[in-house]
């Protein structure tokens, strides 16, 4: 079945998703399973750059991921600590893998790394004890550090570092229209959070503890410009605050969180300069 045929079948099933159950067989199940296999192998991805460098979201692939939950019953999944089991609908990406299969895949997955089937991990990536949800895409040479999470259908570019405890939001809960996208060569600081379809432009640095959602004000300190939902390429971003509105009695209101672009760097500077130096004011 061609990708166009898969998309048509999945779009039609999505419109009638209330009728899709674990008992559903035939073209709908076949199309969803084929789409998940394509995602798992990296042949397709939920979002990709179009010719004008904007990101195009392949909504049919996201819908295939969502439909897969309706098509699958809960089952025991072995491998939990102490000989216990998990109870879930989505098997591990590594289920049935042997040493040769890992060699072919070309990435490292240290003990404690969890990747759900239909996520793609590119060669050269390193997964510390972390969690990568279904439909996600992790690019070549990227490290997902300890206790970091990459949400469903999130797109992580090449040579990124997702630091310890950082969270990259998914599209499943709460349901989002578009995935989070971290472009190539980005550094996401420890315990930072990027959610609600935010795009972090190539070469950007997010300091520790920066939180970005669709409604977060992103303030360029040099110009005063405020943007939402997208960090421009090669931005260095830290946490900040904006003055709040005055209270009814005239007293100063509470300051409100924002993210602040403290500087922009070119590709050469970004490549040569240590992260700590970039974050110094």
From Swiss-Prot:
Keywords: Acyltransferase, Amino-acid biosynthesis, Cytoplasm, Diaminopimelate biosynthesis, Lysine biosynthesis, Repeat, Transferase
The organism's place on the tree of life at top rank: Bacteria
Main location: cytoplasm
Location within or outside the cell: Cytoplasm
Enzyme nomenclature, EC number: 2.3.1.117
This protein's pathway: Amino-acid biosynthesis; L-lysine biosynthesis via DAP pathway; LL-2,6-diaminopimelate from (S)-tetrahydrodipicolinate (succinylase route): step 1/3
Gene3D superfamilies linked to this entry: Hexapeptide repeat proteins, Tetrahydrodipicolinate-N-succinyltransferase, N-terminal domain
Listed GO CC annotations: cytoplasm
Gene Ontology biological process: diaminopimelate biosynthetic process; lysine biosynthetic process via diaminopimelate
Catalysed transformations (reactions): (S)-2,3,4,5-tetrahydrodipicolinate + succinyl-CoA + H2O = (S)-2-succinylamino-6-oxoheptanedioate + CoA
Entry's Gene Ontology molecular function annotations: 2,3,4,5-tetrahydropyridine-2,6-dicarboxylate N-succinyltransferase activity; nucleotidyltransferase activity
Pfam families linked to this entry: Hexapep, Hexapep_2, THDPS_N_2
InterPro entries for this protein: DapD_Trfase_Hexpep_rpt_fam (IPR005664), Hexapep (IPR001451), THP_succinylTrfase_dom1 (IPR023180), THP_succinylTrfase_N_sf (IPR037133), Trimer_LpxA-like_sf (IPR011004)
Protein family: Belongs to the transferase hexapeptide repeat family.
Name this protein carries in UniProt: 2,3,4,5-tetrahydropyridine-2,6-dicarboxylate N-succinyltransferase
Organism encoding this protein: Methylobacterium sp. (strain 4-46)
Organism placement in taxonomy: Bacteria, Pseudomonadati, Pseudomonadota, Alphaproteobacteria, Hyphomicrobiales
Originating gene: dapD
